[in-house]
Amino acid sequence: DPEMSRGLGDVYKRQEMDICGVFSSVEPLMRYVEPYMSSPLYVPLYTYSPFVSTRPWSRILKGKKVLVIHPFAELIVRQYQRREQLFDNPDVLPEFDLKVIKAVQSLGGESNGFADWFEALQYMKNEMDRTDYDICLIGCGAYGFPLAAHAKRQGKKAIHFGGELQLLFGIKGSRWEDPLHAIKCGLPQDFYQKLFTNPAWVRPEEYKNAHSLKVENACYW
């Protein structure tokens, strides 16, 4: 759809990014898109994950109003209530004022009730504008970057985590059970598997649907 492509181009051409996490194998290719970017600082992608560090960046969330935009919103709220059980280092998930917006998704072709992608994006922007927050953590597919840019334009802070955001709240996913994924991220091959042995971690079974297998072979479940 040419009109859809033009619309997406308009959304994504905004130069709002300050820091960009990349796989080391991809970094040499970034020169092809750099003319369209705002000269962000490149960092290894795994450094976005607070639980890989003994001094996690997420410690600065303490006492803040933190908005999380994710399809598993309700489960994130429940898991946060047991935050002290999820990680050995309490700085990974400190105490803060958690607020959530359930992200709109059309996983594998599931209908979401919106006329098109742009209407769904605007809905989530409106929900953000109605919420009082200091920093926004985002994991909702192709909507993530535009929503993070929207937060920045509103004078807020935002981090587009992508899929790994669920791990911050002790939610397992099959993607991270593959040792090759950890190696690709520059981590020990059993890094995620060790996290998953914690009995406080759960699977998002309640969010499975008929289309889940179409999403990278149900990688988030």
Language-model features: locations:
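Single conserved hydrophobic/aromatic residue that forms the stacking wall/gate
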Residues: 1-12
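Redox- and metal-dependent alpha/beta enzyme cores, enriched for Fe-S-associated oxidoreductases
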Residues: 69-113
